[in-house]
Amino acid sequence: MTTPRARAYLARIGIDEPVARTVDGLERLQRAHLTRVPFENLDVYAGREVRTDIGWSVPKIVDRGRGGWCYELNGAFAWLLGELGFGVKQLGATVLLPPASTEFEHLALEVALERRYLVDVGFGDSFIRPLPLDDAGPHDGGSGPYRFEFSGEDTTLVFDGPDGPEPQYRFGTGTFGADDFVEQSERKRRDPQQKWRQSPFATRLLDGGPDRVTLLHDRLKLRRNGEWSEQPVQPGDEWDRALRQWFDLVP
């Protein structure tokens, strides 16, 4: 039976009926989360507290209506999936996109059904459906082609973009918990040289994707039918209005 807290979380992402423990049900949850809960750095940019534990992340998302970064979004989503009866494993990943990354700075999820799937609701403009981990691919990620490269116990997620392969992140077989990401979270939120502290942003899917809206510090970007458009946004009141209009958030 779904708990009241899990039902409140489902309502937050726009789901008001039971979700089957199948890959289709998992995809529905992933797309709903990516649509309703933005990937954003507003608290980090403002110098406010953020934490990695679900005692922080679930209330932030469900009660305060905010988004967050990978530790909050994937940590909370892992809790929800567990409440719904999915088998979930938290992975520590090394981001391979520039700038250079430190080891295990990203939290991603492995979900076990009839196959093992990689799931992520905290990596910005990335795949939007579960990717089977027992098959190198390529796979239709809902937003483009993705595949895996296997080397020993390590797996690398690769996006096959129009300009060639783009390695996204690498992860192993270990299981991670919220405490394992505290040091990384604190370092990134406190260091003024980190990109997370440089300028605010928010991004989410539109209507389950792959259409997307992204608000950067000086412009609003929209992807519709595979084509991007953008318009300038002035910092201050205009930026705050765009944040409210597209994300129902205040800074």
Task: Mark where each language-model region is.
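Short beta-strand scaffold segments in enzyme catalytic cores
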Residues: L107-E110
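Catalytic Cys-His active-site segments of thiol-dependent hydrolases/isopeptidases
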Residues: Y117-G124
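Glycine-centered tight beta-turn/hairpin loop motif at sheet-sheet or coil-to-beta transitions
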Residues: E114-R116, G164
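Mixed-charge, low-complexity segments
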Residues: M1-G67, F77, G82-E103, G124-P251
